[in-house]
Amino acid sequence: MAYSRIVNVEYKSEKDMEMFLSKWKDWMPEHMPVATSRTMVKTGPLSSLLMAVYASSQVVENAREVVEVFFDENRDHMLDIIAFHGEVIELN
């Protein structure tokens, strides 16, 4: 069953947002588990929302553990973070 992880990040400044996203772009392909889909949206001048869909809840948990390493290394750019995860609802 597909599961999703949704992460909203608010950054300290525009420069912090640029630096964080640049680091993420380089780091993510080498470290994050394969996702069915992954979309990042700029939700405000200093915020973004990432939604990734994974094959199972186990992969979501692995993704959470892995991304925490990146977040810990880049906390100086972040003002706040809110994360959600759950089963994908199929409406077909």
Spans of model-derived segments:
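Short S/T/G/P-rich N-terminal loop/turn motif that feeds into the first structured element of a domain
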Residues: 1-69, 76-92
